Amino acid sequence: MRRLTAIPGVLLIAVAAAMWGTDPIIRKTMSGTTSATTIVFGEHVILVLLTLPLLLPALRAVFRAGWRYVGAAVVIGAGASAVATILFTDALIGHSDFITPVVIQKVQPLVAVAAAALLLAERPRPGFWWLFLPALAGFWLVNQPHPFDPSAQGWVVIAEATAAAVLWALGTVLGRYMSRELEFQHVLSLRFFFGLIACAIALPIMGAPAYSNGHDTSLILYLALVTGLVALTLYYYGLQRTPAVLSSLSELTYPAVAVIAGIYAYDQHLAWTQWLGVALILGSVTLLPFRRRRVVAEAPRELLPAAASA
């Protein structure tokens, strides 16, 4: 972990988000064979088992921090980790539309900016919009091959994906909030633990089995290890020293990579406008570490995150 301290937090978050970009295709592969709730429950079982040694110290730390931090942990786990992932997975595997659920994730920064202002006293400076607006335009270009003739299919897909985006954005802000008192590995462990409880409750409600078939279980294992444990470790390690406003912007690499991966997976080709969109996104994210002080007004010094032990 010490080697990661030399890497700007926003870049670690961008790398984690890019790893999440492979996630939708894997979930889409299980369409018709495994329910969304079963998939997400399986992920959380694996993740809790892998982080079990961290659980008791994490629980002690969060209860010592106070009820607000306990509430934040529950919302991150049950809301962002469990419910949001179930909704997003269902939007992918329960419908024929692959692109729309991914496209809608670009609303996350808007939610995160508002929540960060309310909860963390982070204020975007004028410089933020000089990076955010080109990134937003880039997403529009990447996600719409015909940018002046856009399309969106299915209100159910839109509703599920939008709810997931809001919950994930709130999870980003609350994760930053928790990092004021807890180390990143404790936030990670609590996310999985409360997420597993929520998934276990969702199984009987949705009438979903706890286990699928052997083939899909191997895919769930990949999701848990790569886009789950590894990506989220990088994410929370970077988030402890990155304002939530900047984090939400760097997370936009996720839908960009997901759309591009989906296009190639389904034997499609990028138009020149889509490549322009990719360039705008990469440019905005790359400039973040160098423009940080001009982009966001951060919280007072006494509210900065707890130092990592690694």
PLM feature spans:
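Hydrophobic/aromatic residues within transmembrane alpha-helices
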Residues: 30, 39, 43, 91-92, ...
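Glycine-/small-residue-enriched transmembrane alpha-helix faces in small-molecule transporters
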Residues: 1-41, 78, 86-87, 150-177, ...
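Specific transmembrane alpha-helical segments of multi-pass solute transporters/efflux pumps
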Residues: 23, 58-99, 105, 141, ...
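Transmembrane alpha-helices of multi-pass small-molecule transport proteins
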Residues: 32-83, 109-116, 166-171, 188-207, ...
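Hydrophobic transmembrane alpha-helices of multi-pass small-molecule transport proteins
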Residues: 51, 115, 127-146, 197-199, ...
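Loop-to-transmembrane alpha-helix entry segments
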Residues: 102-105, 121-141, 151-157, 213-214, ...
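Helix-helix packing/entry segments at the starts of transmembrane helices
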Residues: 17, 39-42, 101-107, 174-196, ...
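Juxtamembrane helix-entry segments on the extracytoplasmic side of multipass membrane proteins
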Residues: 5-9, 33-41, 63-71, 144-167, ...
